[in-house]
């Protein structure tokens, strides 16, 4: 568990239905060549969240390197292309979220960063390009800086949300819920 949290890495939760053994091995090799790791976790049980989908968690050490500009260009490119591949694989799958009294819905990819100040979450509802991943990474870095400069900023949720003109904005959870009529 410590390696998962302290290495430069990405954690995929409940990805077993989206990737073959060969695809997992290929991703692992790409990451390892650049001193990064990719981990696959399975979580069972009922989940209750306003953000449902397959989680892609960028671990703390990787985020610190992104924020500090210390991630080598080749490793940064591997991260971007891997995120594109992972998100698009999820979006092109036949996976569905099934809830009582509702029609099945396509699975979204959720990129998350967990930190002392809370979480940064981006729910991605469509295929994504390298350029869009770069925008998301820049928004994550900005949200991380905001979170760490907020007095008494513990346990806050920062949501990276796509606007109608395809830009990204950073919202606190109450603002996001209000914007999307969820409260």
Functional labels for PLM-detected ranges:
Residues 1-59, 83-183:
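Short amphipathic alpha-helical segments that predominantly mediate membrane engagement
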